[in-house]
Each structure stands twice: as C-alpha cells, then as structure tokens.
Amino acid sequence: MADYLTKAPQDELDVNIKELVNVLNSFDAIQTIGSCGGHPNPLPSQWEEGTWYVKFDVEQSLEGWHTIEFLAWAINHEYDEDLTVFFMPKSSPPWLNAPSQTLAWVIEGYNKQDPNQLADFLYKVKSDFYKSAKSLETKGD
C-alpha cells in the first residue's frame, strides 16, 4: 500500500465502527482511510446517528482486485436484503489529480444498520470462503 497510508489509532475510531474497520484492514490489499459511526449531534464532518461509513483504498494488484470482487459479492449479494448497506467506488474529479490517485471504495450504512453485524458477517465469510488470489492462481496450474 502507499507509504502515506497508516492505520488510524483505535482510540480515534468511533466505538461502533471499530470492528468493521478491523475486519477490512485484515485483508492484505485494503487500507482504511476514513470512517464515521454516526453521532446524535453531528459536527459538519460527521454523519448522523443511525448512519455510518468506512472509506478505504485498495492496492492496485491482482490481490486488490480479487478482494474488491469478494467484498462486492459478500456485501451486495449475500448480506443486505433491505438495501440499506452500500458498497461502491468513490472518486474526486480525476482531471484534477494524478492518474490512478482518486479512486477509493466506501461501505455506507443507513436506517440504523449495525456495522458490527456487517463486521461479524465479513469475518465469517472471510474465514469460510476467502482465498488469496495467489492461491487461486496456483490451483489452475
């Protein structure tokens, strides 16, 4: 991952978002870069109570792409039947930045979705189904 990315100290994270940040950072190709667990009286940079997000960068590699595919399947296909959790790309205007520097990924929750439930789900499906891209490549040989 890029040198400028460092994991946020646990004491700086909103309590209800820590487990989701931790499970995302447990993937080798992911580095979280922002989060908010929602607040009863939010400041301008915070989200309202009952909503939350985690934003992250993904390594530009086969492993990174494989991890994105896994999360897209797990979150968008297997997890949220009510469509209140969204996994999607986000970007600043690319013409204002260097190439390959604006794309990030975000998971957003609405309608009082519990980020800890998503974290538990991701821990389970990662344990049960996730294989590294490298291990899958060697299977076909």
Can you describe what each PLM-predicted range is?
Residues 1-141:
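Structured alpha/beta or helical-core interaction and ligand-binding surfaces enriched in interleaved
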